[in-house]
């Protein structure tokens, strides 16, 4: 069993380092890291990690700028990652931070770190403890921000 971690140089923080730190805290599952320039390179990085490096799941770590072109690049990334999942029949967990999703850099940093750490836990659970995720179904979990909880009847 192995987890792939694909990150970018475009990111404003070292998301790969955070992911590895969290993975080491919660699991002894080995990992393979693959760093690429930007988010549009993440689909091929994920595919290589799955097919060439023998990973069972990949976490992609991307940072999206705040322009309209950046948003279009994110759509391309997202479509590419879905195609990789369908081609390989394996999960690719997309962990993306959007430059404009927080009002200041301190909050953006907090959201980014929390989102990375929470998705690393999700990836580990998908591999070794899927029942944990089933128990959380419908509970309003959020990665990066506080959970919102379920809608009560």
Curated annotation (Swiss-Prot):
One of its GO terms (biological process) is riboflavin biosynthetic process. This is Riboflavin synthase. Pfam families: DMRL_synthase. Keywords: Riboflavin biosynthesis, Transferase. Signal peptide: none annotated. GO terms for molecular function: riboflavin synthase activity. Pathway: Cofactor biosynthesis; riboflavin biosynthesis; riboflavin from 2-hydroxy-3-oxobutyl phosphate and 5-amino-6-(D-ribitylamino)uracil: step 2/2. GO terms for cellular component: riboflavin synthase complex. The gene is ribC. The keyword Metal-binding does not apply. Its EC number is 2.5.1.9.
